Amino acid sequence: MWTFPVDYDVIVIGAGHAGCEAAYCAAKMGASVLLLTSNLDTIAKLSCNPAVGGIGKGHIVREIDALGGIMAEITDLSGIQFRILNQTKGPAVRAPRAQVDKQLYHIHMKRLLEQVPGLHIMQGTAEALLDNGEKVLGVSTKEGWAYLGKTVVLSSGTFMRGLIHIGTQNFSGGRLGDAASLGLSEDLKRLGFPLGRLKTGTPARLLASSIDFSVMEEQPGDHNVCFVHRNEMFVPTLPQVSCHITHTTDQTKDLITKNLHRSALYGGRIEGVGPRYCPSIEDKIVKFADKDRHHIFIEPEGLNTQEVYVNGLSTSMPFDVQYDIIRSVSGLENAIITRPAYAIEYDYVHGNVIFPSLESKLIEGLFLCGQINGTTGYEEAAAQGLIAGVNAVNKVLRRPPFVPSRQESYIGVMLDDLTTQVLDEPYRMFTSRAEHRLLLRQDNAGMRLSHYGHSLGLLSSERYAMFQEQKACIEQEKERLSKTFRKYGDTVVPLTRVLCRPEVSYQQLLTEFPADVRDLGPIVGASLEMEIKYSGYISRQQTLIRSMERSENISIPEDIDYHSISALSLEAREKLSKFTPRTIGSAARISGISVADIQVLMVSLKKDAH
């Protein structure tokens, strides 16, 4: 086997959303990087819905931007509709979402990656890892040659032993139209990695010209919404479009009920577990039998195509049943299908063999990110890619790993969950997963995390200065307004007290007291308003975090023998040995570990220290 004559610092396998972020961040940190993908024309392909962001997910994209990653930038360049979800709810759960042009997303990502110094993009299919039993050495390809590297980042998506299901038919594939990767699964088994099976699916695509939009509800976008942190208001570079909302009918329900046995999911042909919060239409009909109809969202796939994505109609039914189901939906009576819906099963690696840095516990220098870790979603994958790419470089440079905490970021919440919990379904981020979500708002991601991005070399000094200036402005104005007393109603109160009233906005305060309120602009002003309006809750959460941190960050030695601590419950000994947490906080979040177990563990650690 011929070996390529360059020894890379980092080899990234797979150019999906995790792989692109990993390769970009590693190269930006000065590493020599190989990004290996089976097809250069599918880099950053949006395999499912043509959208980025949403509840929890939008928060993650803003955090990626604050750290110096690229998903936010590519989304803003490719966006054809921008919205803020949960606008009527509290600030912690408001989140940006964008419809993107899927072809332009790929084009912008590929063009950007091609311009990064030190990043070599190469077409080739990874077949096996090269290792010496303890450490990764590189990768061999299906084409018959090898690449050597100090570290390897594996971001294989749904390609590891991918199996596509359309009714009773199934066939090998990483996604429709792309071959599966068979060798990597076998190689990971050889190295002792515990593998499981998960399932996801995607709906059919339809021709827009065959749809009756007149019977549907139009869903336009919002103004001044974006993912990249800015000082000025955002104006999209592309023409903006609307989505449309329709619904299933009684006929839809009857068709699915009558043909349920022909579904790959309900016919017993799928062993993998699917995402709870993105169910197929047959799943919804069965589990919510009392509902007569379900919403369907028609989402355009781009400006230069007639294809639309039918959000809410994912299925693994045979194609003839899909045809009838689609035409039973209001407005889709004459719809022309361009691509069928399908389900896909794939292999993933259990989280107990991965450190929060995303390095494997079994083979040194091997990092895993994206759906191989059991997650679902472009945003979760990209965030893991950033962490894996950064820590691969840290490994090469013999620096400590970078792992943001769950108290300061949604990315930290995800890393902690993936490495302490037993996944029984694909992991998706929600704001409800964070204990301190009022501190983790999408508007303050830059103020929370930009110092990390700057110190890692990912965030420019100019952008870091912008975040620092925003933070300073908010702190100074909070302080000034708290000391500025004016008559409001019958009493004289500080202006911070006025802004705490639910009916008073920052803009109203600015209008009513123009001589006393500094105009910070709508973006920074909105953050100031939230900081003041929710200051009581924020203060309580910060106090709680400080009290927890005293025990949260107590380190656990790598060589600890849990089975020798007889006072631990049997379940605790088994699970702590399986997950090998690095801190008391991580140990406490492993399912099945009780408060009593943690107390026993802390006593044991204190004894050993003495």
Curated annotation (Swiss-Prot):
<keyword id="KW-0819">tRNA processing</keyword>
<dbReference type="Pfam" id="PF21680">
    <property type="entry name" value="GIDA_C_1st"/>
</dbReference>
<keyword id="KW-0963">Cytoplasm</keyword>
<dbReference type="GO" id="GO:0030488">
    <property type="term" value="P:tRNA methylation"/>
</dbReference>
<feature type="binding site">
    <location>
        <begin position="274"/>
        <end position="288"/>
    </location>
    <ligand>
        <name>NAD(+)</name>
    </ligand>
</feature>
<dbReference type="InterPro" id="IPR004416">
    <property type="entry name" value="MnmG"/>
</dbReference>
<protein>
    <recommendedName>
        <fullName>tRNA uridine 5-carboxymethylaminomethyl modification enzyme MnmG</fullName>
    </recommendedName>
</protein>
<dbReference type="Pfam" id="PF01134">
    <property type="entry name" value="GIDA"/>
</dbReference>
<dbReference type="GO" id="GO:0050660">
    <property type="term" value="F:flavin adenine dinucleotide binding"/>
</dbReference>
<dbReference type="InterPro" id="IPR047001">
    <property type="entry name" value="MnmG_C_subdom"/>
</dbReference>
<dbReference type="InterPro" id="IPR040131">
    <property type="entry name" value="MnmG_N"/>
</dbReference>
<feature type="binding site">
    <location>
        <begin position="14"/>
        <end position="19"/>
    </location>
    <ligand>
        <name>FAD</name>
    </ligand>
</feature>
<dbReference type="GO" id="GO:0002098">
    <property type="term" value="P:tRNA wobble uridine modification"/>
</dbReference>
<dbReference type="InterPro" id="IPR026904">
    <property type="entry name" value="MnmG_C"/>
</dbReference>
<dbReference type="Pfam" id="PF13932">
    <property type="entry name" value="SAM_GIDA_C"/>
</dbReference>
<dbReference type="InterPro" id="IPR020595">
    <property type="entry name" value="MnmG-rel_CS"/>
</dbReference>
<dbReference type="InterPro" id="IPR044920">
    <property type="entry name" value="MnmG_C_subdom_sf"/>
</dbReference>
<comment type="subunit">
    <text>Homodimer. Heterotetramer of two MnmE and two MnmG subunits.</text>
</comment>
<dbReference type="GO" id="GO:0005829">
    <property type="term" value="C:cytosol"/>
</dbReference>
<dbReference type="InterPro" id="IPR049312">
    <property type="entry name" value="GIDA_C_N"/>
</dbReference>
<keyword id="KW-0285">Flavoprotein</keyword>
<keyword id="KW-0520">NAD</keyword>
<comment type="similarity">
    <text>Belongs to the MnmG family.</text>
</comment>
<keyword id="KW-0274">FAD</keyword>
<dbReference type="InterPro" id="IPR002218">
    <property type="entry name" value="MnmG-rel"/>
</dbReference>
<dbReference type="InterPro" id="IPR036188">
    <property type="entry name" value="FAD/NAD-bd_sf"/>
</dbReference>
<comment type="function">
    <text>NAD-binding protein involved in the addition of a carboxymethylaminomethyl (cmnm) group at the wobble position (U34) of certain tRNAs, forming tRNA-cmnm(5)s(2)U34.</text>
</comment>
